[in-house]
Amino acid sequence: MIIKIHNQTSFCIKPFKSLLIKMFLPIKEKKIMHLIFVTNEKIQELNSFYRQKNYPTDVLSFHNDLTFFAGLEDNSLGDVFISFPKAQEQAKTFKHSLEREIAFLAVHGFLHLKGYQHRTEEEFQIMLALQEKILQKVGLNLDKTK
């Protein structure tokens, strides 16, 4: 899988790029996924327009049928928008590193693009287990503060 990372914020995301690429590299699918880092204002705008929820959220996923970055490529899986400020806030709240939070949100968005949902407790547990499995492969366990 090819990961294309876009930064639409003033925050430095360079320290996270190699982890994100390493995390998705083992996936043998010949698709492109765009990870777009945005502000709370931008993600709130997207959340309001597409989900009718007028507040900032941490991560949003859009399949390639929408005209963001993914809409420009035939072999695109989709776009994952991550609010960098929300990731910072959640890392503090959950008492783990920003690296771990960003990785978690990227994996969460990826799984949504692959069709996973968490509308029921069963779906939530399946998705959580998959997230943990992917994070463990790069040394970021859900129960660790790394």
UniProtKB/Swiss-Prot annotation:
<keyword id="KW-0479">Metal-binding</keyword>
<keyword id="KW-0963">Cytoplasm</keyword>
<keyword id="KW-0540">Nuclease</keyword>
<feature type="binding site">
    <location>
        <position position="108"/>
    </location>
    <ligand>
        <name>Zn(2+)</name>
    </ligand>
</feature>
<dbReference type="InterPro" id="IPR002036">
    <property type="entry name" value="YbeY"/>
</dbReference>
<dbReference type="GO" id="GO:0008270">
    <property type="term" value="F:zinc ion binding"/>
</dbReference>
<dbReference type="GO" id="GO:0005737">
    <property type="term" value="C:cytoplasm"/>
</dbReference>
<feature type="binding site">
    <location>
        <position position="118"/>
    </location>
    <ligand>
        <name>Zn(2+)</name>
    </ligand>
</feature>
<comment type="function">
    <text>Single strand-specific metallo-endoribonuclease involved in late-stage 70S ribosome quality control and in maturation of the 3' terminus of the 16S rRNA.</text>
</comment>
<keyword id="KW-0690">Ribosome biogenesis</keyword>
<dbReference type="InterPro" id="IPR023091">
    <property type="entry name" value="MetalPrtase_cat_dom_sf_prd"/>
</dbReference>
<keyword id="KW-0698">rRNA processing</keyword>
<keyword id="KW-0862">Zinc</keyword>
<keyword id="KW-0378">Hydrolase</keyword>
<dbReference type="GO" id="GO:0004521">
    <property type="term" value="F:RNA endonuclease activity"/>
</dbReference>
<dbReference type="GO" id="GO:0006364">
    <property type="term" value="P:rRNA processing"/>
</dbReference>
<protein>
    <recommendedName>
        <fullName>Endoribonuclease YbeY</fullName>
        <ecNumber>3.1.-.-</ecNumber>
    </recommendedName>
</protein>
<keyword id="KW-0255">Endonuclease</keyword>
<feature type="binding site">
    <location>
        <position position="112"/>
    </location>
    <ligand>
        <name>Zn(2+)</name>
    </ligand>
</feature>
<dbReference type="GO" id="GO:0004222">
    <property type="term" value="F:metalloendopeptidase activity"/>
</dbReference>
<comment type="similarity">
    <text>Belongs to the endoribonuclease YbeY family.</text>
</comment>
<dbReference type="Pfam" id="PF02130">
    <property type="entry name" value="YbeY"/>
</dbReference>
